[in-house]
């Protein structure tokens, strides 16, 4: 794994990918990117607006392009969007270009961490957030597990502790 200088964080919304990613990048002196923030930077609009205007399909196309571009860099930590793994291309790019770390969390923790966040379009529906998260987990968790080089549980641990556990397992 030594040749894999990139670290890609995958997992569901509310797992802590952005917070933990920044912590890892700081400790390892790597550049940090968040795919959602990069989409917002490139479009000049927030994710909710992109979803409203282009729908999920349009958003996923943008996400795939951003992840393809960023994963070509060297020496980065990238926090990906929770649904990015739906794309076969994204899964292939991440697997081939870095160490993939799956941040695992329970539905209970996801609900607690996302309940006040109005910037998550998939939770802004008439469905109960818990139901949405459960359905997404059924679809996405096998995809996360399939491409993960490292799996770390994030429940009841600080970002610093999780980052430390990940760094200990990296072959850098």
Swiss-Prot record:
GO cellular component, alphabetical, reads: cytosol
Compartments it resides in: Cytoplasm
InterPro entries cross-referenced by the UniProt entry:
P-loop_NTPase (IPR027417), Shikimate/glucono_kinase (IPR031322), Shikimate_kinase/TSH1 (IPR000623), Shikimate_kinase_CS (IPR023000)
- Reactions that this protein is recorded to catalyse: shikimate + ATP = 3-phosphoshikimate + ADP + H(+)
What processes in GO biological process is this protein linked to? Answer: amino acid biosynthetic process; aromatic amino acid family biosynthetic process; chorismate biosynthetic process
Which residues participate in Mg(2+) binding? 18
Q: What is its EC number?
A: 2.7.1.71
Give me the comment on cofactor binding: Binds 1 Mg(2+) ion per subunit.
Q: What does the entry list as the binding residues for substrate? A: 36, 60, 82, 140
| Residues engaged in binding ATP | 14-19, 120, 157
Assign the protein's first listed, main location to one coarse class.
Answer: cytoplasm
- Please give the subunit comment from the record: Monomer.
Family label: Belongs to the shikimate kinase family.
- HAMAP family according to UniProt: Shikimate_kinase
Per its record, how is this protein called by name? Shikimate kinase
Which species does the entry assign this protein to?
Answer: Colwellia psychrerythraea (strain 34H / ATCC BAA-681) (Vibrio psychroerythus)
């Amino acid at each position: 794994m030594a040749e894999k200088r990139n670290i890609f964080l995958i997992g569901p919304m509310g797992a802590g990918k952005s917070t933990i990613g920044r912590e890892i990048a700081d400790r390892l002196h790597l550049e940090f990117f968040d795919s959602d923030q990069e989409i917002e930077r490139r479009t000049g609009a927030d994710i909710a607006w992109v979803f409203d205007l282009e729908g999920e399909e349009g958003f996923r196309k943008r996400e795939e392009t951003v992840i393809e571009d960023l994963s070509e860099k060297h020496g980065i930590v990238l926090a990906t969007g929770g649904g990015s793994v739906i794309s076969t291309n994204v899964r292939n790019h991440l697997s081939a270009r870095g160490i993939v770390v799956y941040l695992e969390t329970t539905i209970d923790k996801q609900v607690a961490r996302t309940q006040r966040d109005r910037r998550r379009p998939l939770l802004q529906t008439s469905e109960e957030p818990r139901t949405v998260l459960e359905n997404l987990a059924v679809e996405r968790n096998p995809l996360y597990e399939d491409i993960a080089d490292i799996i770390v549980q994030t429940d009841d641990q600080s970002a610093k502790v999780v980052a430390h556990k990940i760094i200990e397992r990296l072959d850098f």
